[in-house]
Amino acid sequence: PRRQRQMCIRDRYGADLNAMLAAITDKTRLVFIANPNNPTGTRVSDRQLIDFLAAVPKHVWVVLDEAYLEYVEDEDHLNGVSVLAEFPNLIVTRTFSKIYGLAAVRFGYSVSSLTFADLLNRARQPFNVNSLAMAAVMAALEDDDYVAQSVDLNRAGMVQMTEGLTGLGYEYIPSAGNFVAFDCGEPGNDLFQRMLQEGVIVRAIAEYGLPNHVRVSIGLPAENERFLGVLAKIGANAAASSEMKAPGS
């Protein structure tokens, strides 16, 4: 029977490639890495990734999810497609749901060796992409200005969000994506419910081994401000409630 094994994230919330490599056996057929990672936003270094790919047995496919690649500010960040010729067992996946803003069309793609592409082509649905989605994607690929504006907006929003979180006393995980995860000091699901009551949606990420963290997407300046304002309000209410319940109060 086919089985999957989830690996714990290492210190500072990134992927432990050495642990992943050590976990590979003769029965392993596929390894999955998101770079930048979701939901923490961390990324592995180019050297770490190259060394990992070189060490993975050739019978193991390595799926490198680069959904958030365009948000990475480091110009020298490794583009997985650039090393496909060197590592034929590498499969790079991308999406138009993030930087291009086309989540509704559900359009993604992979770049791989002809061997894997042939296998994937045999298994795919006959009408897996519609013509409207393809037209939208072709238009998006020609709109470089929109992508550049999205990157600039995300950069400014990330500064606004992280400075706001720091000002409120929350520790966040430095992110290379379009979101940031932070330690809310309580079960993330509890904060999720309180934020929801205020009309703000965040994502609890306990299922990723981070029970006290939530992830919030970077939005427009007014949206970021709205989130930070609600978070401050919830924190103030919690502090007041705690003081009222303190012994001798």
Predicted regions and their residues:
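Short, small-residue-biased leader/transition segments that mark boundaries at the very start
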Residues: 2-9
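Active-site pre-lysine segment of PLP-dependent enzymes
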Residues: 14-26, 39-62, 66-99
